[in-house]
Amino acid sequence: MEILNGPSGWIEVICGGMYSGKSEELIRRVRRAQIAKQKVQVFKHSLDIRYDKDYVASHTGLKIEAIPVSSSADIERLVEDDTQVVAIEEGQFFDMGIVKVCQRLADKGKRVIVAGLDQDFRGEPFGPMPYLMAVAEYVDKLHAICMKCGNVASRTQRIIDGKPAYYDDPIILVGAFETYEARCRNCHIVLRRDENEK
């Protein structure tokens, strides 16, 4: 990745399906900035309580301290003037205001790193993530391995009682291995109630 010189900030987006390593990559970038003695603030959406409410945690056990917030306005209010790097976990859970907040922070010369799911369990664009990807200087799409066939997985399969979820189920359901699997395009299934009732 080429780093821009000067006071200009920028936005980096780390996206992909579940189990693709997004949180690990966010943690890696934050730790590199900390080693370089840059002031970093890490935020995560308060909906994410899977492992620890005060940490960004990967499925593999890596973790880093974070400030839980419930809106993009909270991030903008809490970012300190001398912060150089702002890291945001679970970008898909935030309101659409997160796009403008990230742009304003980058305009102030800050490096903004956002990690999140680019698609919901239906395989459709998730919340503000596609808009963040559009305005970011750098976008990295990570992939997992399909838990059915071993191919490259770009989607997240929601499993309820051992079966794929229905299209009209709620978009947000926080969970991990007990609720979601990494799937490729061919193995990803979303049931529709009318099809199932025939």
From Swiss-Prot:
The organism's place on the tree of life at top rank: Bacteria
Localization of this protein: Cytoplasm
Q: Which cysteines are joined by disulfide bonds?
A: none
Quote the InterPro entries the UniProt record gives.
P-loop_NTPase, Thymidine_kinase, Thymidine_kinase_CS
Q: Which reaction does it catalyse?
A: thymidine + ATP = dTMP + ADP + H(+)
Q: Please list the residues that bind ATP.
A: 16-23, 89-92
Keyword entries, A-Z:
ATP-binding, Cytoplasm, DNA synthesis, Kinase, Metal-binding, Nucleotide-binding, Transferase, Zinc
> So where's the catalytic machinery, residue-wise?
90
Q: Cellular component GO terms, alphabetically?
A: cytosol
* Quaternary structure (record): Homotetramer.
NCBIfam families, alphabetized: PRK04296.1-1
Protein name per UniProt: Thymidine kinase
Q: Which organism is it from?
A: Dictyoglomus thermophilum (strain ATCC 35947 / DSM 3960 / H-6-12)
Q: Which gene encodes it?
A: tdk
